[in-house]
Amino acid sequence: CTINYIHDDFLLHNFEEKYDYIIGNPPFFKMKSTNKLLNVYRCNAINKATTNICSFFLDKAINLGNYVALVFPKFLLNTPEFAPTRSYLSEKAIECIIDFGENGFPGVLVETLAVFINNLSRPSNTRVASITHGKYLSQSQKYIFDEKLPYWIIYRDSRFDEVCKKLDFNVFKVFRDRQITNSQLSDSGDIRVLKSRNISDDGKKIINLSDYDSYINYEAL
């Protein structure tokens, strides 16, 4: 058995062959628009709607590997910028999703999961495991990746379906609050960010507070 180490930028390296397995933990961060590598990485990306570098790693791994297993931010399941990714992955066999919650990396409050993708098989059942809750399920991939829903609902069940029947969808656009950090906020900007103290106890009024009100610019989203 021979081990060949390749010390290079994975996203730029020209691989001459495909691999049986690609296993990894790519970096998670949004690249700045001023970064010259952003457009270079995007050239070969499947999902060109995002600037998050982890997406470029996933796209390249999918093109290179027969079987791909990656640790990934949990926002893969539900953020709009990853809708193109969910679309193409839905056509592949997602054999397992392990939900680590915030327990993936000690001291880091980022929810993560591991996704196992079989490029040589057709979609069937997906094993879903919640490390946080000790929950283990076998779900129909078609059921939890239902095209009628905007997100992947990996814990979907009959109770969820009953609630869905009573709701009107596509009324609001959602942005997960954990994607917004204090470093992105300022006292002026394009979009007002409402925090807990900005909302009255009865939920009917917006309260303006000096030295507390925050804004975020479009480019940070």
Please describe what each predicted stretch is.
Residues 9-13, 17-37, 55-62, 68-75, ...:
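Conserved proline-anchored active-site loop of SAM-dependent methyltransferases
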Residues 36-45:
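Short glycine/proline- and charge-enriched loop/turn segments
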Residues 101-221:
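C-terminal substrate-recognition regions of SAM-dependent nucleic acid methyltransferases
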